Amino acid sequence: MQFAGKKTDQVTTSNPGFEEEEEEEEELQQDWSQLASLVSKNAALSLPKRGEKDYEPDGTNLQDLLLYNASKAMFDTISDSIRGTTVKSEVRGYYVPHKHQAVLLKPKGSFMQTMGRADSTGELWLDFHEFVYLAERGTILPYYRLEAGSNKSSKHETEILLSMEDLYSLFSSQQEMDQYFVFAHLKRLGFILKPSNQEAAVKTSFFPLKKQRSNLQAITWRLLSLFKIQELSLFSGFFYSKWNFFFRKYTTSPQLYQGLNRLVRSVAVPKNKKELLDAQSDREFQKVKDIPLTFKVWKPHSNFKKRDPGLPDFQVFVYNKNDDLQHFPTYKELRSMFSSLDYKFEFLSEIEDDDDWETNSYVEDIPRKEYIHKRSAKSQTEKSESSMKASFQKKTAQSSTKKKRKAYPPHIQQNRRLKTGYRSFIIAIMDNGLISFVKMSEADFGSESVWYTPNTQKKVDQRWKKH
């Protein structure tokens, strides 16, 4: 029989074992942190006390019970928490069906630095893949609206909140969905992407503008191009055939293999700036249907400008191997794609860093560096002389500490040429949702001496020393 007082915590019992249990509970260390956080109004938030780690099962259900209580507390906290977004930070995007684009009436966010195009009214227009990407990451709320604009008299009933399933159903084709998957994957990695068919306000190109030739010059150039065979003259074209082996005698095996250069017809791969410019001038006479590349890709950097992005670092072509409407590019189409490349060619030894690219790229048929200097002339005149001197000293200090391209030995340079090639682009192959990136590059194995030449003189000297 037990008796408990109303004003005291003392408990009397006739069982002596109960007193021993009470003494053990008093000796245990009690955790008052949770109770103190409830009592104190200004108490700092802290993690609850954790128990001792069990290194092996103890044969009871105590561990399962502790895990169940912990997971239940977590799910109860999540389910009972207040969900929503701050009205001030909410950004709504409206899908425009007849343009297959989206518009943000009140755009704000860091994504505006690399995505979208602003119009004169201050509204930001997004491509559909940009719209889906921002909605998928939770940056904007997607709405369906028949007429989007700055009309304030539009009713709220015309705005329908779209789910991700609704957005995916708005893709016009499987090819567009494949392009979005590649776009979203590279954006999550931090790259900056723009469609290849979307020109910036300031177009930068590695090649200067072509001068229009007269009809007589065009006809003459076309006739001469017919007789141009891999840097061989017209008179040596006869020996560019199997008859070469009848008119010339070969006494050694190396001569025979070297003669294959004239027998096997190959393609001249541009290896420097001059050859690139010559190949671009010959491209206007090719009558091959161009396959446009899909994306221009820039490495992430803080000075990127949508109006003047500069030359891209990579160019990507998206191909779905399971789509019957698409096909892998043929040899002629690949040749045309290589000739249409316009990016920062990494194999050029004449260009060592980004500053050299500003000099070797063109905007409106003038070097990009000169164009930037003219554009910033107005802002420079407004600056004081002291700030101009400080900026000049800063630029000279940066140029003096500029790292140049590392020089490699000849055999390593040859391995790099054989491995990476020259002009290149990336093919993003879609296979049932899986993306594989394959680098397609031009190589010139025929001009590289890949055979081994033993140094017999050293072996003879070593044998002579032994004897």
UniProtKB/Swiss-Prot annotation:
UniProt keyword annotation of Nucleus present: yes
GO biological process terms, semicolon-separated: tRNA-type intron splice site recognition and cleavage
Region (Disordered): 1-32, 374-413
Highest taxon, organism lineage: Eukaryota
Keyword hit for Membrane: yes
Composition bias, Basic residues: 401-413
Acidic residues bias: start-end ranges: 18-29
Lipid bilayer topology: Peripheral membrane protein
Keyword vocabulary terms for this entry: Membrane, Mitochondrion, Mitochondrion outer membrane, Nucleus, tRNA processing
Subcellular localization, as worded in the UniProt entry: Nucleus; Endomembrane system; Mitochondrion outer membrane
GO annotations of cellular component type: endomembrane system; mitochondrial outer membrane; mitochondrion; tRNA-intron endonuclease complex
Other notes: The tRNA splicing endonuclease complex is present with 100 molecules/cell. Present with 531 molecules/cell in log phase SD medium.
Family: Belongs to the SEN54 family.
Functional summary from the UniProt entry: Non-catalytic subunit of the tRNA-splicing endonuclease complex, a complex responsible for identification and cleavage of the splice sites in pre-tRNA. It cleaves pre-tRNA at the 5' and 3' splice sites to release the intron. The products are an intron and two tRNA half-molecules bearing 2',3' cyclic phosphate and 5'-OH termini. There are no conserved sequences at the splice sites, but the intron is invariably located at the same site in the gene, placing the splice sites an invariant distance from the constant structural features of the tRNA body.
Subunit details: tRNA splicing endonuclease is a heterotetramer composed of SEN2, SEN15, SEN34 and SEN54. Interacts directly with SEN2.
Name assigned to this protein: tRNA-splicing endonuclease subunit SEN54
Species whose genome carries this gene: Saccharomyces cerevisiae (strain ATCC 204508 / S288c) (Baker's yeast)
Gene name for this UniProt entry: SEN54
